[in-house]
Amino acid sequence: MEDKKTTRLRFNLFDVVIILLALAVVGAAVLLRNRSTGADMTRTTTPVRYTVELACVMKDMANQMRVGEDIYRSTDGAYMGKIVDVRWVPHVGREFLPEAGRFVRYEVPENFDIYVTVEGQGYWNGRDIIVEGVSPKVCGEMFVKGKGFAHAGYVCNIDLMGAQIAQGDRTGSGNLEATYVIRFDDMREMLLGAVHKGDQIYEKLTDALLGTVEDVWTEPYGETRLGADGQAVYADKEDVYYMYVRLKGRMVEKADGYYLDSGTELKVGATVTVTSQYFSRMGTFYALEGMEEAK
């Protein structure tokens, strides 16, 4: 009979072999996973800045925001980056004057629009700009917090600080290539540079490709109100615009209509929420300009 010391030694050696085999399996699995997501694992990060507008707030809130401090997403506590700039301007309201038949601008006492610029390490994943795990989009809502403050705002600018990103190269699967226009209402001037020729636009809810931007143009934005005589008056809003985006994309013709890759029917007058690498907002299908067989 073998003594207990020899038996224990054999068991220990056997355990070591099992552990080494298990580690080898785990290591192989990790290696395969890294290879399958190589584009993500080998990404190069670079400093990216974006500005969040916190509209119509008391100036005391701005005093709580200090350059150099960390800022977080208030919904889940995710780190967003560091504050590199804080500025505020008087909040401007607009009111329609029936007697004059136009909108007038006025400053709201003791209320300000605060612009907080955040810097973090970002990268391009082929679809979105990711900054510290957050994907900022111009017009996209952002819930922020820091020491002594928390508020909801909207991203109004993204600065890649000289970095370059490639255009998307996805194509749709429809048999028709269509040219159509989406209109975005009530766009302030600071937001107009977020969509560029060559950008790929997606439907936000489904991530299906809508098309590639062919052209972007603007017109003054206005609203219809009742004048002093009770008649309808159309009046422009100063520094506010309609933004029109012409897209070329694939779709499928069915017996009851034209359908995009997402399954959404393209109907002039229907709304759609879109997203791109810089931008996210709800718009309206404005025009279907033409279509031809896809090549």
Predicted stretch roles:
Residues E2-K295:
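Beta-strand/loop-dominated core regions that host nucleotide or nucleotide-derived cofactor-binding catalytic loops
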